From Swiss-Prot:
This is Protein FAM171A1. The chain crosses the membrane at residues 308-328. Residues 1-20 form the signal peptide. Belongs to the FAM171 family. Residues 21-307 are extracellular. Its main location: membrane. It is a single-pass type I membrane protein. It comes from Xenopus laevis.
Amino acid sequence: MSGSTAVALLFCVLSCSVWGAGSKASHEHNAAAAAQDVTLKVQVSDVSTHQPIADAVIEIFANQVSAASGTTGADGTALVKLQYKLGSQLIVTATKQAYVPNSAPWRPLRLPVFSSLSLGLLPERSATLMVYDDIVQIVSGFQGSRLQPRVHFQRRALNLPGNATYKDLAAFLTAASTPWEIDSFPYLQGSDGNSTGNNSRFDLTPVTAVSFHLLNSDGTDIPVNGPIYVTVPLPTHSSLKHNAHVPAWRFDQKHGTWLKSSIGIIQQEGSQLTWTYIAPQMGYWVAAMSPSHPDPVVTQDITSYHTIFLLAILGGIAFILLVLLCILLYYCRRKCLKPRQHHRKLQLSTALDCSKKDQATSMSHINLISPIHMEMLSSSGEADMHTPMLKPSYNTSRDFGSREELLSHQEEKSRMSLDNLTPSGTLRQVYNKSLDHILMKSRKSAEISEEYTSTMKDEYRRSYNSVICQPLFESKDKDLLSSTNHVTAGSKPNIQEQMHPVPSAPEPEQLIDRRSNECMMSRSVDHLERPTSFSRPGQLICYNSVDQVNDSVYRNVLPTLVIPAHYVKLPGEHPFVSQQLIVSAEQQFEIERLQAELSHAQQMQPPPLSAQAISQQHLQDGEGVEWSTQNAMMSESVSIPASLNDAAIAQMNGEVQLLTEKALMELGGGRPMPHPRAWFVSLDGRSNAHIRHSYIDLQRAGKNGSNDASLDSGVDMNEPKLGRKLRGEKLSMLHSSMQHPTLQEHQQLNQVNVSDSTAYTQLVYLEDMDQSPSECGTAVCSPEDSRPFIEAPAKKSGSQTPSLQEETIKRTTESSPLPLSSPEHEFNINDDSGEDQGENKKSPWQKREERPLLAFNKK
């Protein structure tokens, strides 16, 4: 069984082998029978002349392989025999020297008995050869306005044979400018040959074609090793666009096909389009599109196609660079400002140390008063142009970044202050608006001062008297009320008060006069100005000793200004005038007796009207009174050193103990120390030992019309004579009506109250409406000529003292009209005028040279 199966399998294998061999033999036989001998006649002629071309080489290619070849005779024909298989395509090519080769496909549908083919050759055009030192240029021989094809390459790329020279060279350049000329080039069948051998053939869509050669004298080609730059003008009917890319194909004569070599670009030269490419060698070139890329690849120029994108990128980069530059400048500015601020702080600390000792000087040590930081409201505008100005500096809690910011801030605040100082409504409405605050705050101030007086009256006494100026009210409206009291020369006294509203200051930063710390004091006498006035009328609190002035007083009556008593020139009728600075123990009994007599004398006579009472009586009774600048006369001002305004005073320095009562008596010659006529301010930061103090009759200097001031004086010497005389008349009428005792008796009677009690009085600021509007809110007068209406001292008793408002109302109801001025006062005025005539003979500089000099703190 097994043997028969094996025989059957063997028989099957043998049968398959025999059948395969037989089928292969039959296939080969059929193929051999299909390839038959075919004779092909090829006729070659000149395209331009149609003359036959002899000795032209005919070559037939089948699948890029030469199948047969032949040569034309004198008649330009050639008979070529070949094996042709039905269905295959043949490429018949004719070449001739000095002609552009041409080829044509041949593919019959059936096996022909006879076939003939004609090829026209395009003669190559001679070109102009230009050999330069660096390049070799070939230009078409046709000259004209239109662009001509051109070829150039480097001279060193040209390799001449050993026996050849440049004069043996001949150049040919042929460009197809018409479609029929393009047809004269070889058949446009492209091949994308690859290494696998599987070549695909396809037809090309031509754009233009060009042929260029460089031949030797024997007709051989001269090789060129290097890039060859070719530019060919395109036909006018071309539909290509600028920057379009068209492939460049080279004709391979060995295979009879076009091979892709490089990429050319379409460029615009004027109104003509050109195709430019780089050829690796000379030969036959065509610009054509392949079926895989039927349309030209148009590549837009990045500078035009992506303009917006590029601009956005550049803008972003510029913005980033700008931000980085700003940050760099910011940090550099901060680094530059830090050392400057540190240097300013060092200068400020040095200036503060010096100002503690040398801010202001007079007959005694003003540097015994230690300053603290205090912000003063500035309500004054521009100072009088005829007044020597001393510009004070104010330490504030705000630092300015630059000098420009400081100057602009000062201008803004000065303008704001000037605008707010102008009256915007009736004075009566402003007064009624603040009347309730005045009544309440005045009572509170009187009670507080009485409480401190009772607690400090048992303390030991010092030789100095302190004056504390407390504002009467501290409302958020911050209205400045300036009272002016006048007594006209008519039959009945006419007392009027003029008030000027001031700007409200809800925030300290808005109206505080801020100035740089470097400018502590101006060094020029031409830049002296009146010191900044108080914001509004306040309390004048007189203490017998500096020990009664403690920190608790400041906390209850802030803002406060403490001034030694001998720095203030009080009016002649004031009880503190010519008061001795030394009160010995032996005089204590006499003082108490005089105090009792003074109390009895005050009960017998009506008290004088205070400034506040006169103002209130006038506002209550004077309905319909016309406010006029002719009725308002400014009294002579009390000038305070500007440095005292800068540093609010808190405590007395320990050096006050060095000036004992005995030393003061020795300096005064046993007589009370005269009141100072001027303050002297250290403008250059020197110590008190280097400052000379002088005493000059500033009242006389003001009477002779001089507008000059001492270099070290802060006194306003520009007081009008008319204001002084009218003020003297008013005081004379008041004194005669109230029947005051003589000046010496009045001083002796009022010395009793100085020892134990604290007197409260209302500061009166009189304004001169004839001055510039910027001085409306500032009450300034010299200390010698100041004659405010001061209230009588309060009674010393254990009972509760009536408030200031109640006392004012009581005095107002009990007051009577004041008579006219007495003849005695008129006589005094005449004496003053006589003194003016005598003083006019001396110039201010002579009086300055004649003043006595006195130096303090000599060591």
